[in-house]
A protein has these predicted regions:
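Inter-helical turn/loop segments and adjacent helix faces that build the functional surface
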Residues: 30, 63-67
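Hydrophobic cores of alpha-helical transmembrane segments in multi-pass integral membrane proteins
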Residues: 1-27, 41-62, 76-99, 111-139, ...
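Interfacial helix-loop-helix junctions of multi-pass membrane proteins
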Residues: 100-108
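Catalytic-face loop-and-helix region of soluble metabolic enzyme cores
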Residues: 142
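Membrane-proximal first intracellular loop
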Residues: 2-6, 35, 68-73
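Membrane-interface helix caps and helix-loop-helix hairpins in membrane proteins
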Residues: 26-36
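Generic recognition of flexible, low-complexity loop/linker segments
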Residues: 46, 66-67, 107
Length: 176
């Protein structure tokens, strides 16, 4: 693992930051105190960009140091998951601005490019990567019979998830 000690520290810091970053979804709610809006909603969410960026960089640097890489099914899905997180995190950071949040709050923007791309593309493609690693292990070496179906699975999930998030984001920007 590239920069292993820094990677561990970044992961621990990310876990701590993630516990308090939720309030960027609530910046327009009147019940939330202004201090919490500024500290947790804006500042901690902005710091999330640093921890996520560090994790993203370390993952890519680790893959780079392992080259030459063979584009296996698990690697393909891992890279798709990284792309999902790389697209979803900036959408969340944008929500950390109180002024922009007042416009985008309770629209499809929040659930589209931020939540759905993070979960549907980032998280599930990372989990599919693990499934493609574990499947042969748990089934005593069973092989994937159709690389074509794996490729269809990958591209439909990646394009469909990002496309859905993009269209939901456009709907949110139009006030829906």
């Amino acid at each position: 693992v590239f920069m292993q000690n820094i990677a561990r520290a970044a992961l621990l810091l990310e876990l701590i930051v993630s516990w308090t970053v939720w309030s960027h979804h609530l910046l327009s709610d009147q019940a939330q105190p202004n201090t919490l809006k500024v500290l947790s909603g804006e500042m901690v969410t902005a710091f999330e960009l640093i921890t996520q960026g560090l994790a993203f960089f370390i993952t890519l640097a680790t893959l780079w140091s392992a080259r030459p890489l063979k584009m296996t099914n698990p690697l393909k899905f891992l890279l798709g998951g990284l792309l999902g997180f790389a697209l979803a995190v900036p959408a969340g950071i944008m929500q950390a601005d109180v002024g922009l949040n007042r416009i985008l709050h309770n629209t499809q923007w929040v659930v589209g490019p931020h939540v759905h791309v993070a979960v549907l593309v980032g998280l599930t493609m990372t989990l599919y990567s693990a499934v493609y690693i574990l499947f042969p292990i748990l089934t005593n070496g069973a092989k994937m019979h159709s690389q074509k179906l794996v490729n269809i699975h990958f591209w439909c999930h990646l394009i469909g998830g990002i496309g859905m998030g993009a269209f939901m984001g456009m709907a949110g920007l139009n006030g829906m």
